[in-house]
A protein has these predicted regions:
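Hydrophobic regular-secondary-structure patch
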Residues: 3-102
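Amphipathic, non-transmembrane alpha-helical secondary structure
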Residues: 12, 16, 20, 66-76, ...
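Short regulatory "switch" loops immediately downstream of catalytic or recognition motifs
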Residues: 18-26, 33-35, 121-130, 195-197, ...
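Hydrophobic beta-strand segments of well-ordered beta-sheets in folded domains
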Residues: 55-57, 84-91, 116-119, 162-166, ...
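Acidic-and-aromatic substrate-binding clefts and catalytic sites of carbohydrate-active enzymes
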Residues: 57-68, 97-100, 174-175, 199, ...
Length: 402
């Protein structure tokens, strides 16, 4: 009696659901390894796995671009499938690299991805031959010029997808590139800008037309209020998320919250500057999430927060005053999550167990970490779970099977 050799094929719909569920946004390298292996299982799995691999791509050199261009060649069905799968692209423009990605190639790569929603672009100033560390955003490099985008490159970008999210890190002294990029994409909803603070040109352009939903800033020195007024002219009623990775000046914080507190739902800052900071935050009556990285939180802050709060994230060291936070947790009917960044000595705080008990009794999820980068990521993910679908991670094309 012979054994049956009939094979039962797993339905493709089930395979798609399983692989899509396995996609891990926060560990792009693990995605490369996982889906490269999945692509080798069989022909049916290969197309599904490769589409997931191409969901987020990274281009750092002309070599990367050539490989990517060949893979997404739109004259072939496979190329169109992979190009259509791209949702997020991370690009580095650095003329100091041996085989750097040209601006024209960057623009062509964007046009090959009609469904792309998110672009993360880093630009570095061009220096004379020397002892540069490639990709290092040090002070000297930030004083170097980077070429502006030429008209042909800008025209190419305008023929590409209408992206919703732009992250631009400018490590050069050329402020015009930011204004060029913002002029290309008139439908942006999310903007993250860092590096050298932009300067408005002498002949100020028309106010930025986009109604932004989210803004994140991390400049070496504070931008001028005139720039913020220009950038957020049409975002008074739309800005829901504001993330300031460096401490703003009192005047800047006062200006931002005076004009945007009404719609703001998520606010992140390194510190809360005493009475002035508390008074500014008090204006945010629709706030759902607050993240303060400093281990010192003014005791009056918790009383200033609205009843709409769902997530609070803060730092803890040995001297952090926790009683006001404990009281807020106990009385809140809307709080869903608490995130704690444990600073040096914070693990020995005498009221840390009381915090755990208060969260457990109220059914509030408590998360903690000693890594500030993980702290920021956790805080963002909590609010993102039901508010955002913008992509913020990437996968290198180097691991894709061509």
């Amino acid at each position: 009696m012979s054994l049956s050799t009939n094979q039962v094929r797993v339905p493709l719909e089930l395979v798609m659901n399983v692989l899509d569920s396995a996609y891990y946004d926060d560990e792009p390298e693990s995605n490369v390894q996982l889906f490269t292996n999945c692509a080798l299982v069989c022909k049916d799995w290969s197309a599904i796995a490769q589409k997931l691999l191409f969901r987020r791509v990274t281009l750092r050199s002309q070599t990367d671009y050539i490989a990517f261009q060949q893979a997404v060649d739109r004259s072939t069905a496979r190329g169109r499938m992979l190009g259509d799968a791209v949702r997020s692209m991370r690009v580095t423009l650095d003329h100091n690299q041996p085989y750097y990605l040209s601006q024209r190639s960057f623009a062509r790569a964007v046009t090959l991805c009609p469904n792309m929603q998110d672009l993360r672009l880093a630009m570095y100033g061009q220096g004379s031959p020397g002892h540069d560390v490639v990709g290092a955003p040090d002070v000297n490099r930030m004083k170097r010029a980077a070429p502006s985008f030429d008209e042909r490159t800008l025209a190419l970008l305008r023929t590409g997808p209408s992206i919703a999210s732009l992250q631009f890190s400018n490590w050069s002294d050329n402020s015009s590139t930011l204004f060029q990029l913002l002029d290309v994409w008139p439908a942006l909803k999310s903007l993250a800008i860092s590096g050298v603070p932009p300067q408005l040109p002498n002949e100020a352009p028309q106010p930025f037309p986009c109604a932004l939903d989210s803004l994140r800033m991390n400049f070496q020195t504070p931008p001028c209020i005139d720039f913020m007024r220009w950038l957020l002219h049409n975002s008074t009623d739309s800005l829901r998320t504001l993330e300031l990775e460096r401490e703003p000046t009192p005047d800047m914080l006062k200006y931002l919250l005076a004009h945007h507190a009404g719609a703001l739902q998520s606010l992140a800052m390194p510190t809360c500057g005493g009475h002035e900071g508390t008074a500014a935050i008090r204006q945010c009556r629709a706030l759902r999430e607050l993240r303060i990285e400093s281990p010192w939180t003014p005791p009056t802050l918790c009383k200033a927060l609205p009843e709409t709060m769902e997530h609070i994230a803060f730092g803890v060291d040995m001297a952090t005053p926790l009683p006001p936070i404990l009281q807020m947790i106990k009385r809140s009917e809307t709080l869903k999550a608490v995130t704690v960044h444990i600073w040096h000595g914070g693990e020995s705080h005498p009221q840390l167990n009381a915090l755990k008990i208060a969260c457990a009794r109220q059914g509030v999820e408590l998360m903690s970490t000693t890594d500030v980068r993980e702290f920021r990521s956790i805080a963002l993910m909590v609010f993102a779970s039901d508010q955002r679908d913008v992509i913020h991670s990437s996968t290198s094309v180097a691991g894709v099977i061509y």
